[in-house]
Amino acid sequence: ILRTGSVIDVFNELLTQFNISSIYAHEETGNKWTYDRDINVKNWCKENNISLIEHPTNGIVRNLKNRDDWSKIRNLRMKENLIPKPISLVPIEGIKVGSIPKKDSPIFKNDFTGKVQKGGRDEALKIIKSFIDDRSKNYLFNISKPGISEKTCSRISPHLTWGTISSKEIIKLLNLKKNNSLQNNKKVYNKNLNAIKSRLSWRCHFIQKLETQPSIEFSCMHPFYNELRKDDMNLEFYKAWKEGLTGYPFIDACMRSLNYNGWITFRMRAMLVSFASYDLWLDWRKTGHH
C-alpha cells in the first residue's frame, strides 16, 4: 500500500474509511523535517486515541539518558534473535493499493545523481553475499583507493537506510561466515569481516549523535564554533570545490568521481568535507548539501 503527500492528510483520509486502533512503525532518525513529522504524527495519534507502536531499528537508542551505556545496549541488541517474518498478512478489504511514483515525478525535484543502485530485498541479499564471499578479501587493502573501493566496499548502505536489510542481520551473516570460513588466509579474511562489523558500529554511533542531539544538523557540536566563519560564502571557492576544479589533483579526482557515480567511500567523503571546511574555510552547513 503506497501513498504520497502530507502524512497527516493521508492518515485523515484513511481514518474516514477505516477504523484505526494502532499504527506500527520503526524508529527513524532523519533530519529536522522527519523529526517534526514524527512529532505531528504522535500528536495526531493522541488526538484520535490511536496507539503508536515504534520498534527500534539497528543500534540507535531512543531517549538515551547518556552515552555511557550506548555501546552495551547496542551490542546486546545485535545479539538478539532476528524477528521472524509473519507467515501471512491479512489484506484490508476495500483499500486502494496506490501507485509507485516514477523517477520523473515532481516529488523528486532534481534528477538523480550518478548511478543509482538497485533497491529491494533480493538485491540487498545479493550484495551482502557477494561482499562476504568474495569482495571483502581486499576490503581493508583498498578502502582508501577511491576507484577500486567501489568494488571492494560493501555497498550495502542504501539498503540499511531503506530497511531492506538490518545491521543485526548483517552481523549474524558475518559471524556465521567467520566461524565456517574455508578461505586459505583465514586470518586476513576474518580481519576484513571484523572491519566491516566495526564500520557498522560506527554507522550507528554517528546516527546516535543525531538522534540524541538533532540540533547538530544546523549548529556546531561545540557552540563556540558557530560564529567562527563569516556569514558570507566564498562562492568562487565553493563552485571550484563542488565541480572538482580546485587544482588539488586528488581532491578534484574524488569530487569528479562522486559527481559522476553518486557515491564515494566514506573515508574520501570525509576528506572532501574536511578540505572544504579547513583549507577553503567554507561553512559545513553549505557544503554538506552538495
Locations of the language-model features?
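Short conserved catalytic/interaction loops centered on acidic-Pro-aromatic/His motifs
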Residues: 35, 54, 264, 281-290
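Glycine/tryptophan-enriched, flexible segments
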Residues: 48-50, 69-224
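Contiguous, well-ordered alpha-helical segments that form the cores/surfaces of helical PPI scaffolds
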Residues: 157, 236, 240, 249-259, ...
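Alpha-helical scaffolds flanking conserved acidic
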Residues: 190-197, 267-271, 286
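Active/binding-pocket-proximal capping segment
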Residues: 217, 223-229, 270-290
